[in-house]
Structure formats: C-alpha cells, structure tokens
C-alpha cells in the first residue's frame, strides 16, 4: 500500500511548527476536561506522536490509545516513545485507521487534530457518533477544521520554512476545488542549500472542508456540543 504521508514524515515537526502554538493552546483547554479514569485518551491520526508526548508529560494518570495508519508517521511516533521507556505501558499505537481499529468501549477523551478532513460526510457522521457513544457525560474531544472554511482555489505559496544548520526546509501548498466540500491539495516538501534544491517530494490529498456551521449541526445531531476555541480549533462536549 502506498504511504501518502511518506513525503510529509521527512520533516513533519519542522513543517508543523507555525501551527503548533495554536494546537498547544487548544490542548491546554482540553486537559482539565479529560477523564482518564473513564478510559484511555484516543488520538486519531497520531502523526509523529507529538500529542502523545504532550499528554503523557502532563497527565500522569492518562493512558493513550493512538491510531496512525501511515508507516512513516508511525515510525516517528514510536521513536518518540522509545526515548521514554517509562511510557511504554501507558500508550498503544495501532497501525489501523479509525474504522479498521477496535476502539475502546469507553474513552476518557479524544484528540483529532488534522484528520477530520480525511472523512467524507457519511464517515464524519459515523466518527462523531462513535465519539458520542464512547465519551463519558461531560467528556470532551478536540478537533480542528483546516482552512479555508469552504473550498476555494489556493495558489501555490510557501506556507512553512525552517532553517536547520546549513539547510532550509520549505513547504509549498496549493489547492483546486473539486466541489462544494472537497479540495485537491498538492504539497511539495523541499530541502535546500541556499537556492539549490537537494530533495523534492510531493504529496497529493483530497481533503474535505465541511465548514463550521455544518460541523456544529452534525455534532448536535449526536448530542455533542461543539464550541469554538480558536480560529480553527473546536472542542466537542458530550451532553448528559
């Protein structure tokens, strides 16, 4: 199976750096709402394991149940865990996606950052229903919606660049609309010495952009209260 995130994994945390501060603020809002005594914290699309690390460092009672189907991204997460032997009994990193994995019956909370757009409307409804069924009353999940809020053409532009020693790592993104919810994204990852390109990898994704109003309505239909935290982040609270 082709790993669509193999290109991304090469410098994932470097490329994600411009958005990490926003994610951390959202995680800090989520932390007091987690109920680790009710079940593990579900991390869907765990990526490099950066949110696993954040949780395990700040919630000593938490167990994490992570899903990451990309072999390249999963290798990053497992390498992060391997550096902390004390975490190995507190975290499971499964290679399946949301619908292939056996989910815990009860969850103490959930994190879905950068993943909701991978689900079409029917799949998105099923994900929200599964969360509502497994979260305790008052339990919370953290999600985000990737910009733009509605599909529109995005001209090619550098959206992230980081200098590490003598080399620069650069991410160029562009997108074209497919319909009223989907965008076709093209992401180009470069490593450069000056302006000389050393490596160039490209990944293409079809991503769903449901918009805030649609998200709030879909969440409410399964008794999840969606509340906006920042420009792109939301938490979902399980109503009694």
Regions found by a protein language model. Give the residues of each.
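Class I SAM-dependent methyltransferase SAM/SAH-binding core
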Residues: 49-100
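A short acidic, Gly/Pro-enriched loop at the edge of an enzyme's catalytic core
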Residues: 102-110
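A short glycine-rich, Lys/Arg-flanked "PGG" loop and its adjoining helix->strand segment in the class I
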Residues: 125-137
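Conserved beta-strand signature within the Rossmann-like core of class I S-adenosyl-L-methionine
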Residues: 138-145
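SAM-dependent methyltransferase
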Residues: 145-210
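C-terminal lobe and adjacent flexible extensions of AdoMet/dcAdoMet transferase-like proteins
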Residues: 208-240
